[in-house]
Amino acid sequence: MQKLSTMDTYQMASLRILMAEVVIVRECRHGQVRVLYGDIVGVEGDVMVIPANSRLAGREGLDERMQQAAGEDLREACANIAKERRKSNLQPCGVGEAVTTPAFGLPASNLVHVVGPDCRRPTQDNFRRELMKNSYNALFDAVKTLEPRKTLVLPPLGMDVYAYPHREGARMTMEIILPWMDREEDPGVDMVLIVTHEDNFLNNMKTIYRESEDRFPGVDRTRDYRKGKFQ
């Protein structure tokens, strides 16, 4: 199979994000990281991330809505994973862990279900930064096992019903994802699309990006994108 060039990936991504507004574009060593405002369910990619709970039950927030969009086959797949893990006295998917499934009715090839810290619980809130890093590392490890994975679509972890502080969370999102795309080892991902529908999170993301743009890995390409220099 012919390998897609980075430019091919960018052109394909422009077709995948028609239902969302591109807010930030940053070029890293291995590809672009974009922040989008819109509905993640309508954004196509190779790998899509679901912000799961530890039961893989899909009963609240974005997790529930994404599972509903994927259909009953996904719920059955999650139930089977939970059943098998409980045989070994394990949670279906603990905090800082990830499992993978087919995408079923969602516009992707595969899904990664990741459990972030639930800041409504003091025992997790007190260690939220470390737990958040663990969650992203679990996500990155899971992505490495999947093909294709050129385009990764994800919500910012912990920012939905789990009530992670948005300003801190926005900074951590960039401080974790940008170095991953800019490190020496190629993750095999050409495009990361961070999709949010939360106005407060987006405003905090814009603020921390403006404040720290010159200190983040990579080069800002937002202005070039808005001028139509690339799609």
Predicted regions: what is each one?
Residues 1-231:
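Macrodomain-like recognition of ADP-ribose-binding/processing modules
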